Curated annotation (Swiss-Prot):
Signal peptide: none annotated. The gene is ubiB. ATP binds at residues 126-134, 148. One of its GO terms (biological process) is ubiquinone biosynthetic process. GO terms for molecular function: ATP binding; protein kinase activity. This is Probable protein kinase UbiB. Keywords: ATP-binding, Cell inner membrane, Cell membrane, Kinase, Membrane, Nucleotide-binding, Transferase, Transmembrane, Transmembrane helix, Ubiquinone biosynthesis. It comes from Neisseria meningitidis serogroup B (strain ATCC BAA-335 / MC58).
Length: 503
């Protein structure tokens, strides 16, 4: 009955942080809404805004609910702006777990003692979070490494909270007036995937390797090497990186780092990942970024990445170019063409809504305009028009806000549009014209080479199938005609019989 005990804790938290009223307001009306309003409320925190109380409640419920709040903060298409801003303040910081447990977990996962695995292993962790903690070590071959190890016995705790979230999401969808639009079950399912992805450190290792290949020999970004012989789903061993935290501006200046160049690098790295690679680091907050002595960024923590299809890239390029040209009609038609907008949406209404939220953003010098804010405004419009926002674009918006904030912290005069526009124009130009046609033909050639030899047979089979379908349809039609005829004959026979009997 552990789940019942946990449910009691959650309900008690709702009381303590006065959230029953918030639930009632979301429900709209009805007897359950009235019942919630009648529930006793704690006298504490009564002067705090609802968004603040929700953040404090999630913090008190522990790491899994904190992470859930962080995920919600990236969904301005689902929750109001003030809630998104407040939930973004949630911090995933917990005390480290016992070093003995850490050693046991590593030895169990890698099948050898710590002494055989590492020449040196620092017992005191250098970083700790709700999912894992990190130790510094040295391999017998001499390389300095960082060893990330999952918290022991974490999965049962996560599954218990997730099952309660799924249970709650089902009731939210049934009872709340806004339940279906909020898509609570989809949000919890997305969070479930996000959490389980973070729990698989082999996936993180693969993400690091992919990003490393994409930026091999780059003069802008360093990605640590992965030591796969010392990795499992529970343990990750990567190259140790020395650098200055990107948030330590004073030290960066003292070290002679070119902050203007560094800010430009950040924007260029981001748009290179998006439009060249379609694969981007989606957790680029200052805590995951160091700066090397040679003015390059060092990326850390590869648990969350995003991938983009050519369709996603086209959506982004069209929308950004249209936004900065104030072509709101094109923004509206791009959304309708994407198929993410309900079929009955009128382009004129969507255009007017986009103009209303974006004109205030663009009524300032272009160098001061926030790309992330533009996307956020777009997501706010999406809430009103029931636009289906793709998870990868939400991740992208969150990452873009981080990159912008970081860039302007390094260089307040950073002009993102100046750096981004060449990427957008180059990518759009690359999608049309003879070169693009030739590239697409080359990419599709292997598929056509397989299809063409079997094409006559497939066409013949299709014709036969159509002919057989026509014969089946004709047979069914004939049977129906005969059934109708039989029915009429039966009716006539009954009528004649009745006439004879009445005589």
């Amino acid at each position: 009955m552990k789940w019942l005990k946990r449910l009691t804790v959650i309900v008690g938290t709702f009381y303590r942080y006065r959230l029953a009223g918030l639930c009632a307001s979301l429900m709209g009306s009805g007897w359950i809404c009235a019942l919630l309003k009648m529930m006793p409320q704690s006298s504490k925190l009564k002067n705090e805004p609802p968004a603040v109380r929700l953040r404090l409640a999630l913090e008190s419920l522990g790491p899994i609910f904190i992470k859930f709040g962080q995920v919600l903060s990236t969904r301005p298409d689902l929750i109001p702006h003030d809630y998104a801003v407040e939930l973004a303040k949630l911090q995933d910081k917990v005390p480290p777990f016992d070093a003995r447990l850490s050693r046991e977990q590593i030895e169990k996962s890698l099948g050898q003692s710590i002494e055989k695995l590492y020449a040196e292993f620092e017992t005191e962790p250098i970083a700790s979070a709700s999912i894992a903690q990190v130790h510094k070590a040295r391999l017998h071959s001499g390389e300095q490494v960082a060893v990330k190890v999952l918290r022991p016995n974490l999965l049962p705790v996560i599954e218990q909270d997730l099952s309660l979230m799924r249970f709650g999401a089902g009731w939210v969808e049934r009872l709340f007036a806004d339940g279906k639009r909020l898509k609570p079950r989809e949000v919890v399912a997305e969070f479930d995937k996000y959490l389980h992805d973070e729990l698989d450190l082999m996936r993180e290792a693969a993400n690091a390797s992919q990003l490393g290949r994409n930026f091999q020999n780059s003069d802008m970004l360093i990605v640590p090497k992965v030591f796969y012989d010392y990795c499992t789903s529970d343990v990750l061993t990567i190259e140790w990186m020395d650098g200055t935290p990107v948030s330590d501006i004073a030290k960066l200046k003292a070290d002679g780092i070119d902050l203007h160049k560094l800010a430009d690098y950040g924007v260029e790295i981001f748009f290179t990942q998006v439009f060249r690679d379609g694969f981007f680091h989606a957790d680029m907050h200052p805590g995951n970024i160091l700066v090397a002595a040679d003015n390059r960024y060092i990326a850390l923590d590869f648990g969350i990445v995003g991938t983009l299809t050519d369709y996603d890239k086209r959506y982004l390029a069209i929308n950004f170019l249209a936004f900065f040209n104030r072509d709101y009609r094109r923004v509206a038609t791009a959304h309708i063409e994407s198929g993410w907008v309900p079929a009955d949406t009128r382009a004129e209404e969507l255009e007017a809504a986009v103009r209303a939220v974006c004109e205030p953003v663009f009524n300032k010098p272009i160098s001061q305009i926030s790309f992330g804010l533009v996307l956020m405004r777009l997501f706010e419009v999406s809430r009103r028009f029931n636009v289906e926002i793709q998870p990868q674009l939400v991740l992208l918006q969150k990452t873009l806000l981080n990159i912008e904030g970081l860039g302007r912290q390094l260089d307040p005069d950073l002009d993102l549009w100046k750096t981004a526009k060449p990427f957008l124009v180059k990518w759009m130009n690359g999608q049309v014209g003879p070169k693009a046609l030739w590239r697409n033909l080359k990419n599709e050639a292997p598929d056509w080479a397989q299809i063409i030899p079997s094409l006559p047979r497939k066409i013949s089979a299709l014709i036969d199938e159509n002919r057989q379908q026509e014969m089946r349809d004709a047979y069914i039609h004939l049977v129906k005609v005969q059934q109708r005829q039989s029915l009429w004959l039966a009716v006539i026979a009954v009528v004649l019989l009745l006439i004879l009997l009445l005589k």
